[in-house]
């Protein structure tokens, strides 16, 4: 803001005095006056300008330090996230492996149980068939014996009964 007013103040005397005649130029005196003006200006404003630049430098350094601190924090957060990701990945692999093992075990258990059930059903079927076979044999034997005992016409001995039974059963 001060710069906006400072530059026109420097140029204003030059414009006002530029309308002079074509006389002799006093360039040496003007140069000496300009150097004196710059020296006075430097004497009065140098500390303030230095303070402005130092303050600006310090604010930039502080801002840079904050940015570096945030960068370090974000790197730490990234590393932690990467570690958590790797751990989660490892845990997921463990869960998958465990699930596969459980599937194999459950499949084996179901197969064993099913085989046992099938063997029991086959055994029950065979026992039932054997029982029905014996039942049918007894019924046939009872029928034959009933016929033989009812018919008094034929008097047979034990060997004849045995032969008749064997023929009927076979």
UniProtKB/Swiss-Prot annotation:
The record's HAMAP family line, in alphabetical order, gives: ATP_synth_b_bprime
Cell compartments where the protein resides:
Cell inner membrane
InterPro entries to which the protein is assigned, alphabetical: ATP_synth_b/b'su_bac/chlpt (IPR002146)
Membrane topology according to the record = Single-pass membrane protein
What is the name of this protein?
ATP synthase subunit b
Major subcellular site? membrane
Q: What task does this protein carry out?
A: F(1)F(0) ATP synthase produces ATP from ADP in the presence of a proton or sodium gradient. F-type ATPases consist of two structural domains, F(1) containing the extramembraneous catalytic core and F(0) containing the membrane proton channel, linked together by a central stalk and a peripheral stalk. During catalysis, ATP synthesis in the catalytic domain of F(1) is coupled via a rotary mechanism of the central stalk subunits to proton translocation. Component of the F(0) channel, it forms part of the peripheral stalk, linking F(1) to F(0).
Subunit: F-type ATPases have 2 components, F(1) - the catalytic core - and F(0) - the membrane proton channel. F(1) has five subunits: alpha(3), beta(3), gamma(1), delta(1), epsilon(1). F(0) has three main subunits: a(1), b(2) and c(10-14). The alpha and beta chains form an alternating ring which encloses part of the gamma chain. F(1) is attached to F(0) by a central stalk formed by the gamma and epsilon chains, while a peripheral stalk is formed by the delta and b chains.
Q: Where are the transmembrane segments?
A: 5-25
Which keywords does the record carry?
ATP synthesis, Cell inner membrane, Cell membrane, CF(0), Hydrogen ion transport, Ion transport, Membrane, Transmembrane, Transmembrane helix, Transport
What GO annotations for molecular function exist for this entry? proton-transporting ATP synthase activity, rotational mechanism
Protein family (similarity comment): Belongs to the ATPase B chain family.
Does the record carry Cell membrane as a key word? yes
Q: State a single Pfam family of this protein.
A: ATP-synt_B
Q: Which organism is it from?
A: Wolinella succinogenes (strain ATCC 29543 / DSM 1740 / CCUG 13145 / JCM 31913 / LMG 7466 / NCTC 11488 / FDC 602W)
Question: What GO cellular-component annotations does this UniProt entry give?
Answer: plasma membrane; proton-transporting ATP synthase complex
